[in-house]
C-alpha cells in the first residue's frame, strides 16, 4: 500500500513539473516572439528612411507609406506613358506598385544565409524528397511515377547534382550581375565590369564584339528554359570555357546528352528558389538571388532602370516582349533602397556614386527581427541563426564540404552557423529552412 502511495506522489510531482516546464517554455517562446514598441519603431525607421532613399535615388520615383508599417507603394511620375500590355488581358502596365518591406527584408536576409544550388543532400533530407520533389526538377518528370525507380531519377540528375553545396555564403567579394538591356550600349562599362571579383551573365548574351560595353570577364551564366536547351551554343559564348552554368528550371534529356557528347566541361547546376510570390519575376531576379547568396556586395548593370524605360530591349538583338518593365524597375529600386544592390545605368554611370539614405545594417537587422515576428516566421525573435531550421538532418561524416581554403568571410560565416548548410524550403509555411548539420 505504501508503495502505491509513493508511486502516486511521484507521478503527481512529475506531472506538475512537466506542466511547469511546459508553461515556462511557452512563456519564453512568447516573450521572444512578442511584438514590442522597439519593433514598431524599427519598422517606422525603415519605412521613413526608405521613402527618403527612393526620392533621392529613384530618378523621379516616389515612395509612399501604405496601409501599415510594412507596406509601401512606389509611384511613377504621372506623365509616364506605359507601353507594355498584359498579353492576356490587354491592359497597360500601371504606374504604382505596392511592396511589402517586411516580406522583403525577411526573405532576402534568408537568401543571404542560404545555399541556392540544388544538391543530393537536400533531396535526401526532404521528407519524401525523391517521391515528392526530385521528379519535379526533371523535364517530363511526371512520367517517372514520382521516382519509384529512384536509380533512374538519380541517373537523370547525376550530371547536375553535387552531393553538397559547391558555393557558400560570402564566398565572393564584389560581384556584378549583367542584364541584357539595350541601355548597355549607351555607356562603356566594360573595363569597370571586369574589375569585379565575380561576374554573372544571363542566357545567350554575347561578349564578343561588345567587350567595351559589357566587359569580357564571366564567372557564372544563369539560363532559363530556352537557353538551357541550347547548352552547346551557350558554352561557345565563353572563349575561356570557364563559366559555371546555372539552370533555373529543369534538367532535360537533351541537356544530359549535350553535357556527355559535346562534351560540355563547364560545371552545370540547377538552382533552388526562394519564395517571392508574385513580387518579381524573371531571370534577372534569379541571378540577383544567386549573387546575394554568395557575394559580399552585388552591383547590377544592364537592367534598364532609367526614366523613359517602357519596354524590354536587348543590346545584341531586336526588342522582345519581356514582362512588366515598370514593375521591374520599381522592384529593383526597392532592392537598392534596402541596401541589397547598387544600380549602374547611363544616368547613374559614376562608379563612385553614393546611394543616399540607405538604411544602416543595424536598422535593417532590427526591422528584419520585427518583420519575422509579424510574419510568424519560423524562429522569429531568436538570435540563434539555426532557429529558422524547420527540417534538420545530420550530414554523413564523409561528405563534409571543404571550406578551409576559402576566404575568411566564409569561415567566419561557417562559425556563425556552426558549419550548417542552410537551404530554402520552397513554398514552406513560415519560410522554414532545411538545415544539414555536421555529424557529431
UniProtKB/Swiss-Prot annotation:
One of its GO terms (molecular function) is glycosyltransferase activity. Glycans are attached at residues 113, 149. Disruption phenotype: Male gametophytic lethality when homozygous. May be due to defect in pollen grain germination and pollen tube growth. Keywords: Glycoprotein, Glycosyltransferase, Golgi apparatus, Membrane, Signal-anchor, Transferase, Transmembrane, Transmembrane helix. It is found in: Golgi apparatus membrane. Its EC number is 2.4.-.-. Its main location: Golgi. It is an enzyme of class 2 (transferase). The chain crosses the membrane at residues 6-26. Residues 1-5 are cytoplasmic. CDD domains: GT29. GO terms for cellular component: endosome; Golgi apparatus; Golgi membrane; Golgi trans cisterna; trans-Golgi network. The keyword Transcription does not apply. May be involved in the transfer of 2-keto-3-deoxy-D-lyxo-heptulosaric acid (Dha) and/or 2-keto-3-deoxy-D-manno-octulosonic acid (Kdo) on the homogalacturonan backbone of rhamnogalacturonan-II. Required for efficient pollen grain germination and pollen tube elongation. Does not possess sialyltransferase activity in vitro. This is Sialyltransferase-like protein 2. It comes from Arabidopsis thaliana.
Amino acid at each position: 500500500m505504501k508503495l502505491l502511495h509513493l508511486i502516486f506522489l511521484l507521478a503527481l510531482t512529475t506531472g506538475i513539473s512537466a506542466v511547469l516546464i511546459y508553461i515556462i517554455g511557452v512563456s519564453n517562446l512568447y516573450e521572444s516572439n512578442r511584438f514590442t514598441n522597439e519593433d514598431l519603431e524599427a519598422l517606422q525607421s525603415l519605412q521613413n528612411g526608405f521613402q527618403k532613399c527612393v526620392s533621392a535615388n529613384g530618378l523621379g520615383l516616389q515612395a509612399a507609406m501604405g496601409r501599415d508599417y510594412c507596406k509601401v507603394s512606389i509611384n511613377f511620375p504621372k506623365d509616364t506613358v506605359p507601353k507594355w500590355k498584359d498579353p492576356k488581358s490587354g491592359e497597360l502596365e500601371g504606374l504604382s506598385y505596392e511592396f511589402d518591406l517586411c516580406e522583403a527584408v525577411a526573405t532576402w536576409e534568408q537568401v543571404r544565409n542560404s545555399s541556392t544550388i540544388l544538391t543530393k543532400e537536400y533531396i535526401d533530407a526532404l521528407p519524401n524528397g525523391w517521391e515528392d520533389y526530385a521528379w519535379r526538377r526533371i523535364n517530363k518528370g511526371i512520367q517517372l511515377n514520382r521516382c519509384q525507380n529512384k536509380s533512374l531519377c538519380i541517373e537523370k540528375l547525376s550530371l547536375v547534382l553535387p552531393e553538397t553545396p559547391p558555393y557558400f555564403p560570402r564566398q565572393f567579394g564584389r560581384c556584378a550581375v549583367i542584364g541584357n538591356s539595350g541601355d548597355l550600349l549607351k555607356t562603356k562599362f566594360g573595363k569597370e565590369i571586369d574589375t569585379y571579383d565575380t561576374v554573372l551573365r544571363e542566357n545567350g548574351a554575347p561578349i564578343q564584339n561588345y567587350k567595351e560595353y559589357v566587359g569580357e570577364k564571366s564567372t557564372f551564366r544563369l539560363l532559363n528554359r530556352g537557353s538551357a536547351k541550347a547548352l552547346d551554343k551557350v558554352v561557345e559564348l565563353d572563349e575561356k570555357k570557364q563559366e559555371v552554368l546555372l539552370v533555373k528550371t529543369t534538367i532535360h534529356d537533351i541537356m544530359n546528352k549535350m553535357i556527355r557528347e559535346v562534351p560540355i566541361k563547364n560545371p552545370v547546376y540547377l538552382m533552388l528558389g526562394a519564395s517571392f510570390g508574385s513580387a518579381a519575376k524573371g531571370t534577372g531576379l534569379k541571378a540577383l538571388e544567386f549573387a546575394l547568396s554568395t557575394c559580399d556586395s552585388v552591383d547590377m548593370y544592364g537592367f534598364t532602370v532609367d526614366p523613359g524605360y517602357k519596354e524590354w530591349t536587348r543590346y545584341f538583338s531586336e526588342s522582345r516582349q519581356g514582362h512588366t518593365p515598370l514593375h521591374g524597375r520599381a522592384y529593383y529600386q526597392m532592392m537598392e533602397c534596402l541596401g541589397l544592390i547598387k544600380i549602374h545605368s547611363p544616368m547613374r554611370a559614376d562608379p563612385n556614386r553614393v546611394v543616399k539614405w540607405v538604411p544602416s545594417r543595424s536598422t535593417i537587422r532590427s526591422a528584419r527581427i520585427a518583420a519575422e515576428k509579424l510574419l510568424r516566421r519560423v524562429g522569429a525573435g531568436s538570435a540563434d541563426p539555426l532557429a529558422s531550421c524547420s527540417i534538420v538532418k545530420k550530414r554523413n561524416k564523409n561528405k563534409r564540404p571543404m571550406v578551409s581554403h576559402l576566404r575568411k568571410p566564409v569561415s567566419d560565416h561557417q562559425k556563425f552557423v556552426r558549419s550548417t548548410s542552410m537551404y530554402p524550403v520552397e513554398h514552406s509555411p513560415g519560410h522554414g529552412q532545411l538545415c544539414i548539420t555536421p555529424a557529431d
